[in-house]
A protein has these predicted regions:
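ATP/NTP phosphate-donor binding region
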Residues: 1-88, 341
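A glycine/threonine-rich phosphate-anchoring loop and its flanking beta-alpha core
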Residues: 10, 20, 110-207, 213, ...
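Short Gly/Thr/Asp-enriched flexible loops that form oxyanion-binding sites at enzyme active sites
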Residues: 77-78, 97-111, 144-145
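Glycine/serine-rich anion-binding loops at beta->alpha junctions
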Residues: 86-102, 136-142, 273
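Short alpha-helical scaffolding segments that buttress acidic/His motifs in well-ordered protein cores
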Residues: 194-198, 238-249, 286, 327, ...
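Active-site segments that bind and position negatively charged phosphate/pyrophosphate groups
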Residues: 200-326
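C-terminal charged capping/lid subdomain of soluble metabolic enzymes
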Residues: 301, 308-385
Length: 385
């Protein structure tokens, strides 16, 4: 087991009707920046619930956070936050809005008004604004982790940032907010969460039975309840998927294990270049990447196939192959693409993806740092075959 330190201070308030808890989570009189995206929270009633719960607070608002939040938009939000002298940022939305809020919390207090390079180097202000959130789309686990994935249009980059101080102080998770989501959003969320688990689980075998066992439970939960969520969007399915997606990336299953994240880095590049939904880039890349790395990952792939999918094969190579095939089939069942041809007329250029990774300094990927740009090309070419 790799040495680790684990701390997750985010207060989770889970269940239907819990948006009303904002009235005691944020003290009366607090100046709040309400941050959200394209306005769906106004159509589904969440916005009005938030306003009712914060009746005694002083609100400033910033709308228009993109699905892949833009650094340039966050800079504008920072000006609003400074002018309103807010004491907390409240993100209401999915992972993109929450990512933006966590990044924004440091931008507001940074002396450098263009802090991208500082933050990319891990240099954050000592004092930042607190962040709270109301989750409306489960997928990323952003509501209780320290990571923000931000795109800079000027730099033509999409990269992750990590700042423990920006981890939300609280997260309200009301599964009822998912009732208005369409099947594409729901399918994306399930596959994103599934991939988060896989990238922490299918790596180097270690003495981590607790982490592996919990990862397998989460994967089986998403396999069982993800399709049910698409079929009837029931209260039970919403609850189970929302909680599993949170547990997939709150730090717990990643303790003491080597982590991969190569699928995510390649996926970020594809999204930055072509605007394809984040989860759909993961479903395009992961099956091919697992086949490419099947020999190195064979022990864990075979365990995965047997413990998660119930594969009976006793030969590890055969079990691993079946596990990858079943994963690809699951992505299709959730309505996501698994081949570049599935996103036509977009044509994904391996050269362009590699160029993005090189600009981002992501030239050695995977848990062994053994995936080079040349291998990224092979993975993308294999995906198209």
């Amino acid at each position: 087991m790799v040495k680790f330190e684990f701390r997750n201070p985010t207060r989770i308030v889970f269940g239907e009707g819990q948006i009303a808890a904002l009235q005691y989570l944020i003290p009366v009189g607090t100046r709040v920046l309400l941050l959200y995206g394209g306005g769906s929270i106004k159509r589904n009633g969440v916005y009005n619930q938030v306003l009712a719960a914060l009746e005694g607070c002083k609100l400033a608002e910033f709308a228009g956070i993109e699905v892949n939040p833009h650094y340039e938009t966050i800079l504008r939000a920072a000006e609003v936050a400074r002018q309103a002298n807010v004491g907390i940022i409240l993100a209401v939305g999915g992972g993109s809005v929450i990512d933006a809020a966590k990044f924004l919390a440091s931008v507001v207090t940074a002396e450098n008004r263009d802090p991208w390079d500082d933050f990319a180097a891990g240099l954050y202000p000592q004092e930042i604004l607190p962040v709270g959130c109301v989750l409306t789309l489960p997928a990323t686990g952003s509501e209780s982790n320290a990571v923000s994935v931000i795109s800079s249009i000027e730099r033509d980059l999409k990269i992750p940032f990590a700042n423990e101080a920006a981890r939300p102080t609280f997260a309200i998770m009301d599964p009822a907010t998912m009732a208005s989501l369409d099947k594409r959003q729901l399918g994306n969320g399930v596959v994103d969460a599934f991939t988060h688990v896989v990238e922490q689980y299918l790596t180097i075998p270690g003495n981590t039975p607790v982490q592996y066992g919990y990862s397998e439970v989460l994967l089986r939960t998403l396999i069982e309840w993800g399709p049910k969520l698409l079929e009837d969007n029931s209260a039970e399915a919403r609850e189970n998927v929302m909680w599993a997606a949170n547990q997939a990336l709150n730090g717990l299953i990643g303790t003491g294990v080597r982590q991969d994240w190569s699928t995510h880095m390649i996926g970020h590049a594809i999204t930055a270049i072509y605007g394809i939904d984040h989860a759909r880039t993961l479903s395009l890349v992961m099956p091919s990447l697992l086949r490419f790395k099947a020999d190195r990952k064979q022990v864990m792939l075979a365990r995965y196939a047997r413990n998660v999918w119930g594969v009976a094969a006793t030969d590890d190579k055969m079990a691993a192959e079946q596990g990858i095939d079943l994963t690809e089939g699951f992505f299709r069942r959730m309505g996501l693409p698994v081949k570049p041809a599935d996103v036509a007329p977009i044509e994904i250029s391996p050269d362009d993806v590699i160029a993005h990774l090189q600009r981002a300094g992501q030239i050695r990927l995977g848990e062994m740092a053994d995936i080079t740009p040349l291998q990224v090309r092979d993975i993308l070419v294999h995906a198209a075959s």
